């Protein structure tokens, strides 16, 4: 029997760069019979990942039942000749500090502008597409979550 080919691991500097380049993740919640996965935009401050979550839906129920999650971020070429991903297992915490929430919301506004995202992305954050972008900062239509207590990181690359 031949040994399987293994995808090489990425050093921390490389997966931090992957996290900085991307802005969409998938969060797997485990507080149900079967895992539930949902896409989330995020911002990264160099130490923590932050997410904005609308205040309705299954994710809120699963978060309140069990905040332990897996977060996955990926990048790949269209033909899959090169791909990278990082998976982080940790705990989501709802940010309560008003000043910190404002900073994170401002980071989201800056990221949306920098990436030139469609106004339709506002619907994923609890806003109408024709709302001003600064409504993200001024209004509390979404919860601010922070990934903490990361115990396990798997970061792999090919190409």
Identify the function of each model-found stretch.
Residues 1-20:
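Extreme N-terminal tail/first-helix region
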Residues 12, 56-57:
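Structural motif corresponding to alpha-helix initiation and N-cap regions
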Residues 22-55, 72:
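Short beta-strand segments
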Residues 30, 76-77, 131-132:
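Short, solvent-exposed loop/turn elements at beta->coil junctions and helix N-caps
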Residues 31, 73-75, 148-151:
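Short, structured patches in soluble enzyme cores that scaffold and shape functional sites
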Residues 54, 74, 157-159:
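Surface loops and adjacent helix of pleckstrin homology
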Residues 58-93:
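Helix-adjacent hinge/juxtasegments
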Residues 80-159:
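Charged, gly/pro-rich active-site loop segments
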